[in-house]
């Protein structure tokens, strides 16, 4: 196996534990890897403004694949080195339909996230950890009319997220209706980032495509890459990477796609994987 030169790490459920924190063991091991010349990037469904920039840069992480692969940014400068955005008219057409449902939704534009005032009451209905709730409330820029805002800015939309209230027994409010809307548009692809949501990007855009761009940009061959993840939006990234690592807490789909299953996100599984595949430990 080729020497690993680039590692892409999912954040929620992978790098972050259930308390939304990076363990000291993970921090130390990532920093050790970057000091040894390995490039480490986060690969997330989050926008740039939702990233803990100082924390990530402090352990040597300098790139962020955001919006499920729709944009790649340098940290801490927020320089966008790659973007593959949704068509504005298409997004507006979909949002006009989604707005008729009892859901929460927002859009990602140039590393920031915007939501309409009308969905404020739905934030607390979303089934997600307290830390993520707080992040959503603090990071979103509120506008009166989101469709009108998107049209007037004239800037491409990196990703759109739609969250559902969880009713129990696997049922989410208006998810089936939303799915029926999204299924009418072959120009997009959607998946879940966890927390009972759909996230859609332009068709063909994934964390895997973002990883391929970043590897090419920094001169790393794909057979020198490793990726760690836990949920559906990590699937294509694991498929593209030479070494695909599933967290111990990962979904069955991700575990089946992986070359190796590490410890859980509450057990510093990222550190264990880096120690194994970069430093040759745990043989």
Where are the regions that the model predicts?
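Active-site glycine-centered loops adjacent to acidic/histidine catalytic or metal-binding residues
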Residues: 10, 44, 230
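Mg2+-dependent phosphoryl-transfer enzymes with acidic/Ser/Thr/Gly-rich catalytic loops
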Residues: 2-6, 23, 183, 198-283
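Conserved acidic, metal-coordinating active-site core of Asp-based
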Residues: 97, 101, 108-228
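Asp-based phosphoryl-transfer active-site loop
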Residues: 3-20, 94, 238
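A general structural motif
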Residues: 2-4, 37, 61, 102, ...
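Short, acidic loop-to-helix structural element flanking the phosphoryl-transfer center
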Residues: 22-37, 83-90, 143-147, 202-216, ...
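Short, structured coil segments at secondary-structure junctions
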Residues: 59-60, 68, 76, 184-186, ...
């Amino acid at each position: 196996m080729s020497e690993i030169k680039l590692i892409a790490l999912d954040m929620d459920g992978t790098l972050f534990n259930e308390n939304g924190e990076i363990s000291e063991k993970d921090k130390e091991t990532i920093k050790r890897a970057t000091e040894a010349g390995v490039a480490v990037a986060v690969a997330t469904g989050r926008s740039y403004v939702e990233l803990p920039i100082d924390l990530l840069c402090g352990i040597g992480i300098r790139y962020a694949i955001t919006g499920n692969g729709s944009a790649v940014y340098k940290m801490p400068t927020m320089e966008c080195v790659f973007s593959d955005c949704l068509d504005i008219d298409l997004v507006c057409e979909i949002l006009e339909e989604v707005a008729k449902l009892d859901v929460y939704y927002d859009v990602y534009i140039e590393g920031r996230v915007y939501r309409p005032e009308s969905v404020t009451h739905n934030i607390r209905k979303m089934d997600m950890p307290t830390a993520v709730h707080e992040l959503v409330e603090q990071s979103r820029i509120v506008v009166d009319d989101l469709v009108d805002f998107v049209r007037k800015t004239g800037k491409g939309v990196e990703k759109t997220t739609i969250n559902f209230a969880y009713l129990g027994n696997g049922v989410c409010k208006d998810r089936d209706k939303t799915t029926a809307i999204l299924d009418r548009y072959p120009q997009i692809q959607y998946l879940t980032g966890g927390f009972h949501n759909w996230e859609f990007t332009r068709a063909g855009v994934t964390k895997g495509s973002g990883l391929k761009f970043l590897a090419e940009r920094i001169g790393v061959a794909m057979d020198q890459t490793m990726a760690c993840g836990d949920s559906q939006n990590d699937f294509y990234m694991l498929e593209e990477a030479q070494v695909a690592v599933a967290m111990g807490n990962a979904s069955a789909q991700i575990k089946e796609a992986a070359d190796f299953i590490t410890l859980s996100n509450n057990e510093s599984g990222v550190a264990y994987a880096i120690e194994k595949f970069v430093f040759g430990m745990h043989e």
